[in-house]
Amino acid sequence: MLTPMVAGGVVFPGLFLLSKNTLQRLPQLRWEEADAVIVSARLVSSVQAIMASTAGYIVSTSCKHIIDDQHWLSSAYTQFAVPYFIYDIYAMFLCHWHKHQVKGHGGEDGTPRALGSTWAVVRGYLHKEFLMVLHHAAMVLVCFPLSVVWRQGKGDFFLGCMLMAEVSTPFVCLGKILIQYKQQHTLLHKVNGALMLLSFLCCRVLLFPYLYWAYGRHAGLPLLSVPMAIPAHVNLGAALLLAPQLYWFFLICRGACRLFRPRGSPPPSPCQTQD
């Protein structure tokens, strides 16, 4: 178990540092630290999402029996991804920190003027990103132990499908980068927003009805009978996982309405609702 976790603990922070240093030091680029940090964090999130989605696709398509079939990649990638969620909490804080400095709240050397200011940044970060931080903490403290211990090797198909929920993440990250560089008016931003909306709907919202339908087909039950046929704690867990997805999807839809509504000036992006 430790080998994949150690690998994840090296890969994700290492990729972040490599990207940040490259963007800052290449003579052709010479980016400011704030820009390099924010873009590097988005890059690492996109890479993790692609890896998770690929692993999920391999696992879910390899498991013909949705309960008993196993695939080594399901447990290996779950362990590998745990350090990512810990790293990403810190990476999101760094992004928030640098945005705070850009707004003029830092000292001349780019650091907060006082300890009180530092705590103000921390409080602002936790207030703005509370749901995401809670989500990441739950992944590490709840979902990981459950997937390793409670499942007892069963249900790899469902875990693979859950990993494929990350399909929408690269579109979210690209949208935030485009916003960072004031490209909300471009065709790329609109196409990316539409793809983000579609991928989020299919891979994060409709994922849960699909999993219920898949179990119902396996057990010979109609879809509406599945919730009554499975343990209550499974329904509770699914509801807790679905709730933030519905909230984020609502924000994306609200932003998409503003994006595609004709206006005199460039409108906000659907990604801006999650930034």
Swiss-Prot record:
Keywords: Endoplasmic reticulum, Golgi apparatus, Lipid biosynthesis, Lipid metabolism, Membrane, Transferase, Transmembrane, Transmembrane helix
PROSITE patterns from the UniProt entry: TLC
TM ranges: 130-150, 159-179, 194-214, 232-252
Protein's UniProt keywords contain Glycosyltransferase: no
Domain TLC: 34-261
Entry annotated with the keyword Transmembrane helix: yes
GO biological process: ceramide biosynthetic process; negative regulation of fat cell differentiation
EC category: transferase
Enzyme nomenclature, EC number: 2.3.1.-
Expression tissues: Each isoform has a distinct expression pattern. Isoform 1 is highly expressed in brain. Isoform 2 is expressed at low levels, if any, in all analyzed tissues, with slightly higher levels in testis. Isoform 3 is expressed at very high levels in testis and, at lower levels, in white adipose tissue. In epididymal fat, isoform 3 is expressed at higher levels in obese mice compared with lean mice. By contrast, isoform 1 and 2 levels are significantly lower in obese mice compared with lean mice.
Catalyzed reactions: sphing-4-enine + octadecanoyl-CoA = N-octadecanoylsphing-4-enine + CoA + H(+); eicosanoyl-CoA + sphing-4-enine = N-eicosanoyl-sphing-4-enine + CoA + H(+); sphing-4-enine + hexadecanoyl-CoA = N-hexadecanoylsphing-4-enine + CoA + H(+)
Cellular component annotations (GO), alphabetically ordered: endoplasmic reticulum; endoplasmic reticulum membrane; Golgi apparatus; Golgi membrane
Summary of the knockout phenotype: Knockout mice exhibit a significant reduction of the cone photoreceptor light responses, thinning of the outer nuclear layer, and loss of cone photoreceptors across the retina compared with wild-type animals. Knockout male mice are fertile.
Function: Involved in ceramide synthesis. In vitro, isoform 3 stimulates the production of C16-, C18- and C20-ceramides, isoform 1 slightly increases the levels of C18- and C20-ceramides, while isoform 2 exhibits only minimal activity. May interfere with adipogenesis by stimulating ceramide synthesis.
Protein name: Ceramide synthase
Organism, scientific name: Mus musculus (Mouse)
Encoding gene (name): Tlcd3b
